[in-house]
């Protein structure tokens, strides 16, 4: 669960946008280069499990969180009805029987 404010912070999918004016994958905006070797230019974006950008742990159950920038895992966020990134209350779970099975 993610609130509307934190939804903007979520990562984007790598697939290119459909062509339109102002798309982020056109060469005019500097987004996508022609004839570029992806193996040489993607070293910064590669996943490094032991590097600086490690995933954090959940503040409730201490398991690893698989979403960068989140403080709570999806199971705990669903049970408590909070945003996984900021912890803001998203859903009133008073009359619900929440399980994460």
UniProtKB/Swiss-Prot annotation:
**Which cellular component terms (GO) are annotated to the entry?**
cytoplasm; dendrite; dendritic shaft; dendritic spine; glutamatergic synapse; neuronal cell body; postsynaptic density, intracellular component; spliceosomal complex
**UniProt GO BP:** cytoplasmic microtubule organization; mRNA processing; protein localization to microtubule; regulation of postsynaptic density assembly; regulation of postsynaptic density protein 95 clustering; RNA splicing
Q: Which UniProt keywords apply?
A: Cell projection, Cytoplasm, mRNA processing, mRNA splicing, Spliceosome, Synapse
User: Is-annotated flag, keyword Cytoplasm?
Assistant: yes
Region (Sufficient for interaction with DLG4) residue ranges read 95-101
Predominant place of localization:
cytoplasm
Subcellular localization(s) per the UniProt record = Cytoplasm; Synapse; Cell projection, Dendritic spine
Region Disordered: what ranges?
19-38
- Going by the entry's taxonomy, the superkingdom of the source organism is recorded as Eukaryota
Reported effect, residue 101 to A: Abolishes interaction with DLG4. Does not redistribute DLG4 to microtubules. Associates with microtubules
Q: Where is this region: PDZ3-binding?
A: 98-101
Quote the tissue specificity entry.
Answer: Expressed in striatum, cortex, midbrain, Purkinje cells of the cerebellum, pyramidal neurons of the hippocampus and neuropil. Expressed in heart, brain, lung, liver, kidney and testis.
Task: Spell out the molecular function terms from Gene Ontology.
Answer: microtubule binding; PDZ domain binding; protein-containing complex binding; scaffold protein binding
**Function summary:** As a component of the minor spliceosome, involved in the splicing of U12-type introns in pre-mRNAs. Involved in the cytoskeletal anchoring of DLG4 in excitatory synapses.
Assembly: Component of the minor spliceosome. Within this complex, interacts with RNF113A, as well as with SF3B1/SF3b155, SF3B2/SF3b145 and PHF5A/SF3b14b. Interacts with DLG4 and TUBB1. Interacts strongly with the PDZ3 domain of members of the DLG4 family. Associates with microtubules.
Which PANTHER family does UniProt cross-reference here? CYSTEINE-RICH PDZ-BINDING PROTEIN
Please report which protein family the annotation says this sequence is part of: Belongs to the CRIPT family.
Q: What is this protein called?
A: Cysteine-rich PDZ-binding protein
Q: Which organism is it from?
A: Rattus norvegicus
């Amino acid at each position: 669960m993610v609130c509307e404010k934190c939804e903007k912070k979520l990562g984007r999918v790598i697939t290119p946008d459909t062509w339109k004016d102002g798309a982020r994958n056109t060469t005019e905006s500097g987004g996508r280069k022609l004839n570029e070797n992806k193996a040489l230019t993607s070293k910064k974006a590669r996943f490094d499990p032991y590097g600086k950008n490690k995933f954090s742990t959940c503040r409730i159950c201490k398991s690893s969180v698989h979403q960068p920038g989140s403080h709570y895992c999806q199971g705990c966020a669903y049970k408590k009805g909070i945003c996984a990134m900021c912890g803001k209350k998203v859903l009133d779970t008073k009359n619900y029987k929440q399980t994460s099975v």
